[in-house]
Amino acid sequence: MREEKQLLKQEIIDKIQRYPAFVIMQYAGLTANQANDFRRQLGKIGGDVEVVRKRVLLKAAKDAGLELDVSSLNGHIGLVFLGEDPIEATKTVFKFSQEREKIIQVLGGRFDGQIYSGDDVEKLSKLPSKDEMRAQFLSTLEAPMAQTLAVVEALLASVAYCLDNKSKQGSEEPENSASEA
């Protein structure tokens, strides 16, 4: 293997080991502007794209301890390394693909050390992102507290209303008893 390919292979191995998740994509008809736009969108959320030859990818995966299905790897291949929130980055990949007439096809991916097919990766992309899950969790925690607070406020308001009525009744009684005498 030539020195350039060795360096590329080592770079791929380093990224496979550094990133907890990645997606293997096939692209066709992707222009330079579209590729730059894709890289920019992924860069905003901590992702990275690496275009790689099939042989280099297979050797790098083997050296990194991964077994990839060779039969699904056809055409131009790229790796999308997903940042801290792999679901959000995967959503970005599928959104980009759908907006541009599916010029990117996801062949598979790795999440938390597990290899998934393209269909499974698409299903994972439909899950809520970490931020969405945090918001759902906090709203789940907040709802009972908000309801409890509303009940306590209603009780305090009713106690205040009762005391106000009692004080009004107390101030009216001396006038009534004075008029009877």
Curated annotation (Swiss-Prot):
Q: Does the keyword rRNA-binding apply?
A: yes
Coiled-coil residue windows = none
What SUPFAM superfamilies would the database entry show? Ribosomal protein L10-like
Question: Which Gene Ontology BP annotations are present?
Answer: translation
**UniProt keyword list:** Ribonucleoprotein, Ribosomal protein, RNA-binding, rRNA-binding
Question: Please, which domain of life does this record's source organism belong to?
Answer: Bacteria
- InterPro entries linked to this entry: Ribosomal_uL10, Ribosomal_uL10-like_sf, Ribosomal_uL10_bac, Ribosomal_uL10_bac_type
The record, for CDD domains, names: Ribosomal_L10
Query: Which Gene Ontology cellular component annotation is one that this UniProt entry carries?
Result: ribonucleoprotein complex
The UniProt GO MF terms for this protein read: large ribosomal subunit rRNA binding
Which protein family is named in the record?
Belongs to the universal ribosomal protein uL10 family.
Q: How does it assemble?
A: Part of the ribosomal stalk of the 50S ribosomal subunit. The N-terminus interacts with L11 and the large rRNA to form the base of the stalk. The C-terminus forms an elongated spine to which L12 dimers bind in a sequential fashion forming a multimeric L10(L12)X complex.
| Summary of the function given for this chain in its UniProt record | Forms part of the ribosomal stalk, playing a central role in the interaction of the ribosome with GTP-bound translation factors.
Q: What is the recorded name of this protein?
A: Large ribosomal subunit protein uL10
Task: Give the originating organism.
Answer: Protochlamydia amoebophila (strain UWE25)
Q: Which gene encodes it?
A: rplJ
